[in-house]
């Protein structure tokens, strides 16, 4: 995922996912945030990434696999754990939030 950054907004009742594209030394938003479980964040992210036909399928699958891991962790145990633990578990993901 070196060309892309998975960003996660970690909240008490929801988790939200977005993707940025790495541009030079910074990044540029590629998608908006999609919320789980309020909406189907994974499906929304998949649909949005598929619209960007210039993203290689291998990269798209890698992003979606990491999104799946983050959502599963949040559902199973993460929402009851501090944000610092999520950051340690997924060092390649950019986290922000209040939980």
From Swiss-Prot:
Disulfide bonds: none annotated. Belongs to the chloroplast-specific ribosomal protein cS23 family. Probably a ribosomal protein or a ribosome-associated protein. The keyword Ribosomal protein applies. It comes from the Bacteria. Part of the 30S ribosomal subunit. This is Probable small ribosomal subunit protein cS23. One of its GO terms (molecular function) is structural constituent of ribosome. One of its GO terms (biological process) is translation. It holds the Pfam family PSRP-3_Ycf65. It comes from Acaryochloris marina (strain MBIC 11017). GO terms for cellular component: ribonucleoprotein complex; ribosome. Keywords: Ribonucleoprotein, Ribosomal protein.
């Amino acid at each position: 995922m070196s060309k892309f950054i998975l960003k996660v907004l970690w909240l008490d009742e929801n988790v939200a996912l977005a993707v940025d594209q790495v541009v030079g030394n910074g990044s540029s938003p590629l998608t908006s945030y999609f919320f789980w479980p309020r909406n189907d964040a994974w499906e929304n992210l998949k649909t949005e990434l598929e619209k960007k036909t210039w993203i290689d399928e291998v990269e798209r699958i890698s992003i979606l696999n990491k999104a799946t891991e983050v959502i599963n962790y949040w559902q199973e145990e993460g929402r009851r754990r501090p944000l610092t633990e999520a950051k340690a578990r997924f060092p390649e993901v950019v986290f922000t939030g209040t939980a």
